[in-house]
């Protein structure tokens, strides 16, 4: 018995499908969601969102948002959400370098916080893109 998942950003519906399991990065740590899970509303962190369907894990890079869990449905409202094959590694690497440079400059506390958030997002994108390469080489 699968659970219906919708991942939505301001720009688009990223995914609408029945899945077997969801593993999400929340403010309180990683949370695994299976069908008939207890209702839950939680804040999502920047991180890797793993979706399992038919024994295959598909990683997404998300940059925060909210997750509503009902017994047979999960809705994720994400700031951004990208599948591994949607990530431009060169762009993510450039964003990582730019964020590290801004952190080194330490212009203001606000700029530092924004640069750290950009760095976390770029690192997650790079990790998810690498996972796809590793899985492709393994298969």
Swiss-Prot record:
GO terms for molecular function: ATP binding; proton-transporting ATP synthase activity, rotational mechanism. Its main location: membrane. It is found in: Cell membrane. The keyword Membrane applies. It comes from the Bacteria. Belongs to the ATPase epsilon chain family. This is ATP synthase epsilon chain. It comes from Roseiflexus sp. (strain RS-1). The lineage of its organism: Bacteria, Bacillati, Chloroflexota, Chloroflexia, Chloroflexales.
């Amino acid at each position: 018995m699968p659970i219906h998942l919708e991942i939505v950003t301001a720009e688009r519906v990223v995914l609408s499908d029945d899945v077997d399991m969801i593993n999400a990065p929340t403010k309180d740590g990683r949370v695994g969601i299976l069908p008939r899970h207890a209702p839950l509303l939680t804040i999502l962190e920047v991180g890797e969102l793993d979706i399992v369907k038919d024994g295959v894990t598909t990683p997404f890079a998300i940059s925060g948002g909210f997750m509503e869990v009902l017994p047979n449905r999960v809705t994720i409202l994400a700031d951004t959400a990208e599948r591994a094959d949607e990530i431009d590694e060169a762009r993510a690497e450039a964003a990582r370098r730019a964020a590290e440079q801004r952190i080194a400059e330490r212009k203001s506390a606000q700029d530092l916080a924004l640069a750290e958030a950009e760095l976390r997002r770029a690192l997650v994108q790079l990790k998810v893109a690498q996972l796809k390469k590793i899985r492709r080489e393994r298969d």
